Amino acid sequence: MAQSPQVLLSALADESAFDLTAVEQFTALAALGLEYYSLRFIDVGKGVKNVMKLSLPEIRRIRQLEDRYGLNVASIASPIGKTKLVDVDDGTRNAFVPFERYLARDVARACELAHAFETKLIRGFSFYPPKGSAPADHLEQAVDRIGRIAEACHRSDLTFGLEVEANLVGRDGHLLAEIHRRVNHPGLVLVFDAANLVVQGFSTAQVWSQWEAMKPGLGWVHVKDYRKTTARPRAGHVEEGKLADFVPADRGAGGHARILADLHGFLPALTRRLKRRGIPGVFVDLEPHLRGGGQFAGTSGPDGMGIALRSLCGVLDGAGIAYHLRDFDDLLAARGLG
């Protein structure tokens, strides 16, 4: 019998913890059987920090805890690209940073962190155009910046993953796919997230269309879902802090069953392509927001993360996609008895 293609399960670790301490995050993920996590917000004893703000002693302590809990970093879940594209007052609280400074400081820092945590992947975004403006009007400027970020990552032997999300230039799958096509760089891949489309008012059929548009550039998948509503117009600005109807992957309007069944067909080829860049495989990264989400983070708690993981595993089983959760053989190997 042919072996089923396999994904690597991961999660935004901070979603699994109420207080965001490293021990709380890692305990939850290890208990769920995960071996990979994406690093975003964490408390290593000096308060909660974004990964970009971690000190060298904090990095060393996290690495020690990773060894203790048997975890590896899937991606640096950075906020790169969540700044204004244009320095205008548009009524938002988004910051503007001159791009040359941003490239030399923030992007370089993200690359340093990826090497420190021994991952090949940095997650980022496609910049905020002025609120109320047409994203297509800012495509050329976004393409230029993202291309330079991709080149910086590539020169560091890393890959930049561009996530689809509301309010950005690449707010839908077609725009993000066009950015990827124009940048045309091996250091750039796309990160699909169904809920980030549903919250904008897109139907399940429209989410599918955007998945198809993103497939040629796909690098990995974020999994969260949202209960369909009709109260939110597609063209409008999404107030991310007010979103409250996130659900597991088998209950929302994102169409994960069809999407992951489709992934099954090209998963072996995508895995081979990523491995040529030193990436261990195709990550399916849980970011469920089951207790709520906002512009820069969300929370699910340890129980919510467990609910989300079991839901995802059921959808993967239905799609015929294999995955691995830690078992007794892994525990024996960790004890040196395997």
Q: Predicted regions: what is each one?
A:
Residues 46-47, 58-61, 205-211:
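Ligand-binding grooves and catalytic loops that recognize ribose/phosphate and carbohydrate rings
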Residues 12-14, 28, 32-56, 77:
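N-terminal substrate-binding region of glycoside hydrolase catalytic domains
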Residues 28, 68, 84-190, 303-304:
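Active-site acidic/histidine proton-transfer and metal-coordination neighborhood
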Residues 38-39, 73-78, 119-126, 159-163, ...:
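Short beta-strand segments at enzyme active-site cores
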Residues 43-57, 80-104, 126-138, 236-247, ...:
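Surface-exposed, active-site-proximal loop segments in enzymatic domains
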Residues 2-10, 19-35, 67, 173-338:
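Histidine-acidic metal/acid-base catalytic patches
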Residues 56-78, 143-156, 182-183, 254-261:
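Alpha-helix-loop-beta-strand connector modules within alpha/beta enzyme cores
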Residues 12-16, 40-44, 78-81, 127-129, ...:
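Active-site beta-loop-alpha junctions enriched in small/polar residues
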